[in-house]
Amino acid sequence: MKAEIKEFMDALKARTVGESEFHQAVQEVIETLWDTYQANPKYKANKILEKMVEPERVIMFRVPWIDDKGEVQINRGYRVQFNSAIGPYKGGLRFHPSVTLGGLKFLGFEQTFKNSLTTLPMGGGKGGSDFNTKGKSDNEIMRFCQSFMTELCKYIGADTDVPAGDIGVGGREIGFLFGQYKRIRNEFVGVLTGKNREFGGSRVRPEATGYGTVYFAQHMLAEKGEKIAGKTVAISGFGNVAWGAAQKLVQLGAKLVTISGPDGYIYDEKGLTQEGVDYMLELRASNNDVVAPYAEKFGAKFFPKAKPWEVKCDIAFPCAIQNELNEDDAKKLVANGCQMIVETSNMGCTAEAVNYANAHITFAPGKAANAGGVAVSGLEMSQNSMRYSWTAEEVDAKLSQIMKDIHDTCVKFGKEGNKINYVKGANIGGFIKVAEAMCAQGHC
């Protein structure tokens, strides 16, 4: 690490003690774009990078709600409004016991770059609560969402900050949140994305992140003169993202051999069929967080408490949680002939895994590869603004084009001789657009 980068990171860590995920995200970005930053006197003189790592606003609030026993419960709510240089703050709400301010700052920082790459006018933000939806009744979740939105509604709006769903926040929660916003503000506007189609949602939104990451992988392969059809693929997870990726992979003729859950992973040597992909929805609807029943139903092998990165594959898609793929996993994949790792979950790979993969095979960072979800959220915002609804085919075509544009940006800024450094390309491409906007608006 360069001395100047170390000095920058030491200063950041001193101001943000204990926020390790945020530090990891910032360091990965800075190491790839430091030379670009130093080469531009305008950025350096006005400390654009120093400003970029500080959120414009952090909102923290208590969320009191009443459980089914009539007892008062208290949770903590957050909204990190990170950067609005290129558009309204945009990013999901996460309801999970692991939610912390540092984790949300990491996600909001990443979101700023990801949204910039989509070419759509969206800034970066993230929010949520340490509330756990698991084990709660629909009425308890509704009362919590209503209390959460009663406070959050003071700080968001269709042209200010447009949250979406994330872990623990699906269509049910978005509906409760939107209903409360509408009651309080007495207006029907596109203040949230991920809504049901009946009240302003977009087609293709549930599968968008998964579809988008496969489109991105297609473009990566096309850059090498290859196609995705016939490739053996391993993915982790079985939620919305993994399901969307699985659906598109099967449609395009790839051989998908794994899905996984907290209980372990299944290996289907023949490859998942459309029936198997559809069964993923049943598994998720059961709320049991297990994939073992797939093995029983389809005659696949189940490996308890193991990760799918030990199987032979051409492409790996980590689709579950952050830091799920470590350096040892990356080494196993490379040793087994894996050609590409396409990071589909947010920061799905550890910093060590990214460095190892980038040095040995082709690696696509999440801020580029998983931008399909927020891209279709942006398209939902556009449809809400126009009071119009596009067909599934129209949305899918726009998503495919956006992922191509993101890939082209990564190639433009990440070309290193005969190789493309997608991490570098995504970071520089996302940074320059935001930095130029900040300078033009007098942020510097």
Residue ranges and their predicted role:
Residues 96, 115-229:
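Glycine/serine-rich phosphate-binding loop and adjoining beta1-alpha1 elements at the start
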Residues 193-196, 201-312:
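Glycine-rich phosphate/diphosphate-binding loop of Rossmann-like nucleotide-binding domains
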Residues 2-25, 220, 332-444:
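Adenosine-phosphate binding glycine-rich loop
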Residues 264-363, 368:
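Rossmann-like adenosine-cofactor binding region
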Residues 42-73:
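Structured beta-strand/loop patches that form or line metal/cofactor-binding pockets in enzymes
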Residues 3, 17, 21-24, 28, ...:
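Conserved active-site and cofactor/substrate-binding residues in soluble primary-metabolism enzymes
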Residues 71-112:
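N-terminal cap/recognition module
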